[in-house]
């Protein structure tokens, strides 16, 4: 009898059949905001090293004591071992995060080598990340506890293992949190990204890189559905600005150093083992506790809509991107030819309004929500998202298969199990 973890983690982690008959590579061209973005990049790097110097110093002292040594190297090598013909060896950053844990398990399930990296920060309850790490460990995946800005740690990992690929999912997430702690976004999403790229460019051989951008880069764009070629020069939040800056930075490293890089613009990912700061997660918690939930509305009381994308579909897109990533062409920091640079949307293509999402949660929780409708504040949120996924479909056969009704049913089942609710008992009304 399969466990609930087996049932709720991705069940289709195999390679995609890649249709190359209509292959398209999507280049990131300079927009009218290029000067602004480079200015943001330079200011951000300066701010990160000034504002976070004490943080990095103290963090480095802690990390120095938590990695290294013969036993540690053995664990890293063992976890990175490939167990299938034609397999890959992947460093997954943010491995105990929501998407990172699912991707790591899917890679391991099909026989790839996987080593995780995570700093276990307290943006949300670290106990959930540690529970994910326990699950990864039970599948033979070793997760290194360390910070993306620790260059010595990253260099050591690449010294121990010649990774063929990097799946970069570590980032400071969330739109509203940027109003409270903007420096954390610079530290993780810009300085951390540059640090990782510096290590990858110097590696020999260089790995191919797939990394998580975000649908938030479309910002205030009103054209729908969003396509990769649409304008992305109107960020609505600092989070979006750092992700757009990341796209410009990765393009530069591809151009100068020959790194094969694929950026993935995720659209509102949800599912089991998700992030507690996401609306569907907090709605579930508050509904079960009998607390009111806040539902934002746009101008003229228009309901907000999101292209909610189930985690299994995102995982399939991540693996398809890895399998079709191509090869980096540099060696020891020197470019020897052009390398692929691609950007893809990964969404569901079927936007659903937030009130309908709440309707579905009520159905599966068997509890009515106490709804409080308020006007959307100017805190970085956007009124709608809608993905055009034709590029990912043409390049590596990406095809989402889970609708919101089915996906939320799986999430609710996991939530009730993980947090110890007795579904046979009368829930709080």
Curated annotation (Swiss-Prot):
<dbReference type="GO" id="GO:0032580">
    <property type="term" value="C:Golgi cisterna membrane"/>
</dbReference>
<dbReference type="InterPro" id="IPR036291">
    <property type="entry name" value="NAD(P)-bd_dom_sf"/>
</dbReference>
<dbReference type="GO" id="GO:0050832">
    <property type="term" value="P:defense response to fungus"/>
</dbReference>
<dbReference type="InterPro" id="IPR001509">
    <property type="entry name" value="Epimerase_deHydtase"/>
</dbReference>
<feature type="active site" description="Proton acceptor">
    <location>
        <position position="239"/>
    </location>
</feature>
<keyword id="KW-0472">Membrane</keyword>
<protein>
    <recommendedName>
        <fullName>UDP-glucuronate 4-epimerase 1</fullName>
        <ecNumber>5.1.3.6</ecNumber>
    </recommendedName>
</protein>
<keyword id="KW-0333">Golgi apparatus</keyword>
<keyword id="KW-0812">Transmembrane</keyword>
<comment type="subunit">
    <text>Homodimer.</text>
</comment>
<dbReference type="Pfam" id="PF01370">
    <property type="entry name" value="Epimerase"/>
</dbReference>
<dbReference type="GO" id="GO:0000138">
    <property type="term" value="C:Golgi trans cisterna"/>
</dbReference>
<dbReference type="GO" id="GO:0050378">
    <property type="term" value="F:UDP-glucuronate 4-epimerase activity"/>
</dbReference>
<dbReference type="GO" id="GO:0071456">
    <property type="term" value="P:cellular response to hypoxia"/>
</dbReference>
<feature type="binding site">
    <location>
        <begin position="89"/>
        <end position="120"/>
    </location>
    <ligand>
        <name>NAD(+)</name>
    </ligand>
</feature>
<keyword id="KW-0413">Isomerase</keyword>
<feature type="transmembrane region" description="Helical">
    <location>
        <begin position="36"/>
        <end position="56"/>
    </location>
</feature>
<comment type="function">
    <text>UDP-D-glucuronate 4-epimerase involved in the synthesis of the negatively charged monosaccharide that forms the backbone of pectic cell wall components.</text>
</comment>
<keyword id="KW-0520">NAD</keyword>
<dbReference type="GO" id="GO:0050829">
    <property type="term" value="P:defense response to Gram-negative bacterium"/>
</dbReference>
<keyword id="KW-1133">Transmembrane helix</keyword>
<keyword id="KW-0119">Carbohydrate metabolism</keyword>
<feature type="transmembrane region" description="Helical">
    <location>
        <begin position="87"/>
        <end position="107"/>
    </location>
</feature>
<dbReference type="GO" id="GO:0005802">
    <property type="term" value="C:trans-Golgi network"/>
</dbReference>
<dbReference type="GO" id="GO:0005768">
    <property type="term" value="C:endosome"/>
</dbReference>
<dbReference type="GO" id="GO:0033481">
    <property type="term" value="P:galacturonate biosynthetic process"/>
</dbReference>
<dbReference type="GO" id="GO:0005794">
    <property type="term" value="C:Golgi apparatus"/>
</dbReference>
<comment type="similarity">
    <text>Belongs to the NAD(P)-dependent epimerase/dehydratase family.</text>
</comment>
